[in-house]
């Protein structure tokens, strides 16, 4: 009997459901959508809806919705999207503390039922939640991946392509640091099919693109009026899973646990990584000028301040 690859998605909201649909079409593995008891219908309904699209799209992926965490058993990858969004009147500290508890409990359950899996974290604030999952699960650092960098870089590349009226496929650029206002798009490493972006766009316009990238999530929230982005975040997670299952050795920005890289230790935030079958197989340190390095340290400090507000055992 052939062992089919298994992907469990904890949280069947917009992002989790969209990711399940993408993965099903790509036939990367069988899928389990996990939700809370009170949201059983959402998990099972979305799973069935995706399953029923199989004859049209032409895929044979198994998609199962459940409220039983034990159904993640023997998963190869577990994606953690569970958590609450920031509500009106809620402080950032309250959001962090609430989601930290959710992620901590979930990571312990993953360690129990899927001890050999790779965990991909999307719950916000994602840098600190990735650190929480790392500490709570006890997994080796290469099997804990936070994802924001692919999303942030995709936004950055999109805005550059729009400004230049060129194909987004020809825009290459990386975004490092924390997911938020302190993220660092590497302008000096941004090229359009080999041509440095600084040769094509004014410094003022580049600064505007960088600022728009940093506010990219908030821009979507404002436009939607309710909820947040989910198509692009789900696609970013898909790209990571594809790199793992196909051992592609992709150079992708990921949130990783650092032990001295970029002058940072005991922290998780976005850096260039090689993603393959083992998860994060290598962290790549790129050359930076002094200004970029100082901005990255500022970003690390911002992430550390949130992390230090929590108590880790």
UniProtKB/Swiss-Prot annotation:
Which reaction(s) does its UniProt entry say it catalyses?
(S)-malate + NAD(+) = oxaloacetate + NADH + H(+)
Highest taxon of source: Bacteria
User: For this protein, what is the EC number?
Assistant: 1.1.1.37
Which GO MF term does the entry hold, naming one?
A: L-malate dehydrogenase (NAD+) activity
**Matching InterPro entries:** L-lactate/malate_DH, Lactate/malate_DH_C, Lactate/malate_DH_N, Lactate_DH/Glyco_Ohase_4_C, Malate_DH_type3, NAD(P)-bd_dom_sf
Q: Which GO terms describe its biological process?
A: lactate metabolic process; tricarboxylic acid cycle
The enzyme's first-digit EC class, named in words, is: oxidoreductase
**Which keywords does UniProt give here?**
NAD, Oxidoreductase, Tricarboxylic acid cycle
Name the residues that bind NAD(+): 11-16, 99, 122-124
Name the active site residues. 179 (proton acceptor)
**NCBIfam families given in the database record:** MalateDH_bact, PRK06223.1
Q: Which family does the UniProt entry place this protein in?
A: Belongs to the LDH/MDH superfamily. MDH type 3 family.
PANTHER family for the chain:
L-2-HYDROXYCARBOXYLATE DEHYDROGENASE (NAD(P)(+)) (PTHR43128), L-LACTATE DEHYDROGENASE (PTHR43128:SF16)
Summarize the protein's role: Catalyzes the reversible oxidation of malate to oxaloacetate.
| Name of the protein in question | Malate dehydrogenase
What gene name is given for the protein in this entry? mdh
């Amino acid at each position: 009997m052939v062992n089919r690859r298994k992907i469990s998605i904890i949280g069947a909201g917009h992002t989790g459901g969209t990711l399940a649909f993408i993965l099903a079409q790509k036939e990367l593995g069988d899928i389990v959508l996990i939700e809370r008891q009170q949201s059983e219908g959402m998990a099972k309904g979305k799973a069935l809806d995706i399953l029923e699209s199989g004859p049209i799209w032409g895929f044979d992926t198994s998609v199962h919705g459940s409220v039983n965490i034990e159904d993640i058993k023997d998963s190869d990858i577990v994606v953690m999207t569970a958590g609450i969004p920031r509500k009106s009147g809620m402080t950032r500290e309250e959001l962090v503390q609430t989601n930290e508890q959710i992620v901590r409990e979930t990571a312990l359950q993953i360690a129990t039922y899927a001890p050999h899996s790779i965990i991909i974290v999307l719950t916000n604030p994602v840098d600190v939640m990735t650190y929480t999952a790392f500490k709570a699960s006890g997994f080796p650092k290469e099997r804990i991946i936070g994802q924001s960098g692919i999303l942030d870089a995709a936004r950055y590349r999109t805005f550059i392509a729009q400004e230049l009226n060129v194909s987004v496929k020809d825009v290459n650029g990386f975004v490092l640091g924390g997911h938020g206002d302190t993220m660092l798009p590497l302008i000096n490493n941004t090229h359009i099919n080999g041509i440095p972006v600084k040769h094509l766009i004014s410094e003022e316009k580049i600064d505007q693109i960088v600022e728009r990238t940093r506010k990219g999530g908030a821009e979507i929230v404002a436009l939607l009026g309710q909820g947040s982005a989910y198509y692009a975040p789900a696609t970013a997670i898909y790209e990571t899973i594809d790199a793992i299952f196909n051992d592609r050795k992709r150079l992708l920005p990921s949130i990783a646990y650092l032990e001295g890289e970029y002058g940072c230790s005991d922290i998780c935030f976005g850096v260039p990584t090689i993603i393959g079958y083992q998860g994060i197989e290598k962290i790549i340190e790129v050359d930076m000028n002094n200004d970029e390095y100082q901005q990255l340290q500022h970003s690390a400090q911002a992430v550390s301040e949130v992390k230090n507000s929590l108590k880790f055992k």
